Amino acid sequence: MTEEQRQQIHAWWQVFQHGGELTEIRIVGKYTDSGYYKDINNLIRDVEANEHKGAVYFTINPPKEACYGRKQQEQMPTGGGKMATTQDADVASRRFVLLDLDCVTGVSDVNSTDEEKTYALAKCRDIFRYLRKEGFNDGIVNDSANGYHIFLPCELENTEENTKLVKRFISAIAMQFSDEHVKVDTSVFNASRIAKLPGTFSAKGSVESEDRPRRMCKILSVPVAVVATPRQYFERIANLYPEEERPSAYNNYSTQRFDLDDFITRHGIQVTKKIAVADGTRYILDHCLFN
């Protein structure tokens, strides 16, 4: 492990574990190795000894204190035996909402090119500016090795209602910002979500690839003060995401789904591009229908 790696892990510890909270480190490869830590020295020791096995992750939200009683307390047992890891019900509370910006590479299990990452960085900046304009407190931005992570500080109880809120919030961001180059991952809404540990490398692809290299995950920017954004700001963005229409007097209690493709064809609307986003499709029209 290099000095730069150690510095990145120490920086992550200061930012994410400043209250001395419990964290789980998980290494996902042929097997899944796991450890629960309150001591950064033990954590670095085990990451250094095991990082060659796969990608290294941390829980973005603190596990309940009881998880510290598991057999992985301050250690990472080896041998590939099955062990308990942090599940949604094991999370004490939500401290961060993750926006995960993935480069669209066209094929699976490869690292991104420099050009693909350039698109992702521009998108990351667009989202960051948008959220700041909407009143959000600044988040922490990480280079995830193959894309970018924005960690938005929050203070949310770990409830089903808040899980639905976070899911709709992320989907609303994806609806607005995902395109053919960059995808905002809508699957990262769960409370026990893990993210790439700064100071560790991507485990994807070939180590010999020059145009798709294995890169280190790094912290890029941290606000002067990490301050939680109030719940109502997340709600306001989440409410932009459309809900599926239910049968009502307004639609004659119809149970049929509106066929947008058929509507476009019947009315001769010119579509220049269709882009898959979140749970739907974005249509880029040749011209505004109201001009």
At which residue positions do the language-model features occur?
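Residues embedded in well-ordered secondary-structure elements
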Residues: D88, G139, T186, A276-V277
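Short, glycine/acidic-rich hinge or "gate" loops at secondary-structure transitions
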Residues: I140-N146, V182-F189
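Signature for HUH/AEP ssDNA processing cores
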Residues: M1-N146, P153-A172, L260, I269
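Histidine/cysteine- and/or acidic
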Residues: M175-K183
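Positively charged, low-complexity intrinsically disordered regions
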Residues: I27, R215-M216
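Modules that initiate DNA replication and primer synthesis
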Residues: R95-E134, A145-Q176, R193-S209, R215, ...
